[in-house]
């Protein structure tokens, strides 16, 4: 493993770059949404940061006449701290910018720059430094550069799939940030030569700081958002459950990105969105409609209303996000064991195309 520690570092740096890019949309989405404009801002800023990192990383590499690998170790150590600051920067800057600036594009660009600019810049610097460290023979510069670039790209491909399919829906953004920071910390230790007792003490202190910053970010988030009682990352979106009180009532809401999807009156248990009761008109126009289909469940406020009002009718709900169903059970009182309710966890369009219960 020691023989390939530079290659491992380059691969993982490429992977972490894409992990950060993917979680950037999850961090920004509750404040500015996740539209094409927001993704454009995120990708543009991160590519800008990376291009600066490649350039300055090359300059640092050329100044490293002795090919001291400790320089790369120090870079990774700094990157670990910069990455661990992401949860704090989300609350301090992104939340503040979203409150006081109306232009979503400006908020997205500034937020991506402040929160992800430095980690992206530092991670990009890894490749040119690694190229210099591997180049003991001028005749092999091309092959070495190609190998390092290939490893970084393969790492980015791996990071894209691993983050999108596994990390985000199962761990959540804050845990992923902590994991990325600790991984960078481990790589920093792995690369450093001539480790002393003093060095190990310093690295232990850094680990404590990394963990503390992560928890501090979570604490500040709760202080600044006391209404949010649940913050969940699913395969499809970031979901907030909040409790909001007015002079008359207390409501529990479900928010996806910047949009309010569902809410209930906590005192009565009734759905808060009165317009949903217009769905009951189906019974006025067709008294024989006993098997109903609803595309999209969210917090299942209407299906629960339906089941209570029409005890002899059945409803099928197609909800693509299984986390929505879980949250509705935990926070909104959905009873998935009701024999008159059937839930399909799939895309609504696919369901309509392929189900055999469709009636025309």
Predicted regions: what they are:
Residues 264-276:
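Conserved SAM-binding loop and adjacent beta-strand
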Residues 274-281, 347, 351:
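Well-ordered alpha-helical segments embedded in enzymatic catalytic cores
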């Amino acid at each position: 493993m020691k023989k390939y520690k530079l290659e491992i570092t380059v691969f993982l740096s490429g992977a972490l770059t894409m992990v950060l890019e993917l979680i950037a949309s999850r961090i920004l989405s509750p404040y500015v949404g996740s539209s094409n404009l927001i993704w454009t801002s995120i990708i543009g800023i991160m590519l800008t940061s990376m291009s600066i990192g490649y350039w300055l990383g090359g300059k640092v590499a050329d100044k490293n006449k002795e090919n001291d690998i400790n320089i790369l170790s120090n870079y990774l150590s700094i990157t670990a701290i910069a990455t661990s600051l992401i949860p704090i920067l989300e609350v301090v800057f992104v939340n503040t910018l979203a409150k006081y600036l109306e232009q979503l594009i400006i908020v997205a660009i500034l937020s991506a720059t402040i929160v992800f600019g430095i980690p992206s810049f530092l991670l990009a610097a890894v490749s040119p430094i690694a190229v210099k460290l591997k180049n003991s023979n001028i005749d092999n510069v091309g092959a070495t550069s190609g190998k390092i670039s290939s490893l970084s790209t393969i790492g980015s491909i791996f990071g894209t799939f691993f983050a999108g399919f596994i990390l985000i829906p199962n761990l959540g953004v804050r845990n992923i940030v902590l994991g990325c920071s600790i991984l960078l910390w481990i790589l920093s230790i792995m690369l450093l030569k001539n480790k002393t007792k003093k060095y190990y003490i310093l690295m232990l202190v850094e680990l404590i700081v990394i963990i503390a910053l992560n928890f501090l970010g979570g604490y500040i988030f709760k202080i600044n958002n006391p209404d949010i009682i649940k913050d969940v990352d699913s395969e499809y979106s970031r979901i907030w459950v909040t409790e909001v009180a007015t002079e008359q009532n207390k409501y529990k809401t479900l928010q996806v990105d910047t949009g309010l999807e569902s809410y209930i009156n906590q005192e009565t248990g009734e759905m808060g969105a009165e317009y949903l009761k217009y769905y009951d008109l189906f019974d006025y126009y067709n008294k024989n409609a006993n098997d109903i289909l609803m595309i999209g469940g969210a917090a299942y406020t209407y299906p629960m209303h339906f089941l209570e009002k029409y005890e002899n009718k059945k409803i099928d709900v197609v909800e693509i996000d299984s986390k929505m169903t879980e949250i509705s059970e935990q926070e909104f009182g959905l009873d998935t064991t009701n024999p008159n309710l059937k839930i399909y966890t799939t895309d609504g369009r696919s369901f309509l195309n392929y189900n055999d219960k469709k009636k025309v």
